[in-house]
Amino acid sequence: MVAAYANDNWSQPNLQPAREDINLLLEDVTVDTFVQNLQENITTDSLDFDIQVLNGDSSKLGKKDFTHNVNIIFYDGDNSEHKMREFFINMIDFTEDVFTLVVDDANIEENVAITKRFIDAMGLKILYERELLNDQEDVDMWWNGLYVVVLSKSTL
């Protein structure tokens, strides 16, 4: 079974690309827009999926919000060290012993550095890591880069 949880506070409903040569018309993006996109693009009829949309500040999430422990987290949130650490500390309570953390905007070196400082501070073991970097807002790649790290809470 795949248990998927999506969370956002929808604080940037009209977020636009920084590059002027990219023309995307994004207006009034809300939780309803996200749910509609899910319904149009994901077929769960033949697959064992549990998809939940959690609306609100991700730093307030806890084990109570999840039916299953999480083994993949895609963090695409506030890039301040305070908010990233706040979320990362909370996520430890609802992740499996081995889990994958994907951090968006890895082209911003500080985002990767913040994540690595958290990993060290929590004593997590890195089983695998990779930085997927590319040009800023690359529509054919990872937009602003990804940092992928497989972590273990135990020392193995």
Which stretches of residues belong to each language-model region?
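S-adenosylmethionine/decaboxylated-SAM
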Residues: 1-156
